Each structure stands twice: as structure tokens, then as C-alpha cells.
């Protein structure tokens, strides 16, 4: 006949226990550490600030002069390769410059129609008849006399590559 054995297991109960929350006292060291801020002479600091300020003023003044002297940039040829000046109508103040930049590498130039510039302006002084053949080749023209200046690209005039500069 079979026999059955029973085993008894005792499980301790943890109900009602509380964790102690006291912290151990901190230990103090007899070694002291003193941190000091760096010493800066006020005159050296203000001299440096004055120098930086002058440099910033000079740089910003130079940028303003360049920005006002070069009033417009005209791409010769479109980003998609189209023949044209972009923009084709430009307005600037007298004494300002327009920079023409060859955009895609076709041979381009800028020729002013002698019958379509203000009286007294010599087109040979402002024409750029030499071809710009490579991308990003450029030249600038400063317009001194107020009025309307019509220009074109000599090899692409028949394709409508024309523009107008209005100087006030």
C-alpha cells in the first residue's frame, strides 16, 4: 500500500515591520579647501572690450559700405539654363554698382544700347563686351548718372536676353 508523507513549511510573516530612516551622521574632515576666483584687472578687461568694440564697429561699417556700393547682383542665365538676365529690371541709386555674374557658363556679355542710355553717358565706358565663359565669372558697373539704361547680351539678344537698369 502506498504511504503519503506530508511536509510542513513555516513562512515567516513580515507584516508590521518598519524601515529605519535615520541617516548616519556625516564625518567632518580636518582638511579645508578654499577656492578663489581668478583675479582680473579692470583696466585690462575694459581695454580688451574697447578693442573688440572698435573691431566690431569697423567690420560692420565696412559691410555697410560694401552693401551700399554693390546694390544689385544680376545672374546672366537662369538656374535652369534659360537665356536671360535675372532679374531683368534693376533699380539702383546713382553711385551704386550692379554686379553681373555668369550663372551657368554660356558665353555672355553686357552691351548698353547707345540710343537707350541717359544723355552724356558713353556706352564704351560701361559696356563689358568681353565674354564671360565660366560659371561665377563676374564684373561690376557703377552707375553715376540718373536715368534708364537698356542692355543686352550680344550673342543672345535674338533670344530675348535683355534688361533695364533704372538709376535714381
From Swiss-Prot:
InterPro entries: BlueCu_1, BlueCu_1_BS, Copper_blue_Plastocyanin, Cupredoxin, Plastocyanin. Transmembrane segments: none annotated. Disulfide bonds: none annotated. It is a peripheral membrane protein. It is found in: Plastid, Chloroplast thylakoid membrane. One of its GO terms (molecular function) is electron transfer activity. Its cofactor is Cu(2+). Signal peptide: none annotated. SUPFAM superfamilies: Cupredoxins (SSF49503). GO terms for cellular component: chloroplast thylakoid membrane. Residues 71-168 form the Plastocyanin-like domain. The keyword Membrane applies. This is Plastocyanin, chloroplastic.
Amino acid at each position: 500500500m502506498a504511504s503519503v508523507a506530508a511536509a510542513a513549511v513555516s513562512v515567516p510573516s513580515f507584516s508590521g515591520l518598519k524601515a529605519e530612516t535615520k541617516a548616519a551622521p556625516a564625518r567632518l574632515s580636518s582638511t579645508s579647501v578654499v577656492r578663489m576666483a581668478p583675479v582680473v584687472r579692470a583696466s585690462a578687461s575694459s581695454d580688451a572690450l574697447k578693442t573688440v568694440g572698435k573691431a566690431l564697429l569697423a567690420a560692420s561699417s565696412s559691410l555697410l559700405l560694401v552693401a551700399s556700393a554693390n546694390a544689385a547682383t544680376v545672374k546672366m542665365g537662369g538656374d535652369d539654363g534659360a537665356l536671360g538676365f535675372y532679374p531683368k529690371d534693376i533699380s539702383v541709386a546713382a553711385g551704386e554698382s550692379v554686379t553681373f555674374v555668369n550663372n551657368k557658363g554660356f558665353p555672355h556679355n553686357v552691351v548698353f544700347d547707345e540710343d537707350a542710355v541717359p544723355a552724356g553717358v558713353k556706352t564704351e565706358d560701361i559696356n563689358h563686351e568681353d565674354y564671360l565663359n565660366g560659371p561665377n565669372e563676374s564684373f561690376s558697373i557703377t552707375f553715376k548718372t540718373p536715368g534708364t539704361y537698356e542692355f543686352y547680351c550680344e550673342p543672345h539678344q535674338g533670344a530675348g536676353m535683355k534688361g533695364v537698369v533704372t538709376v535714381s
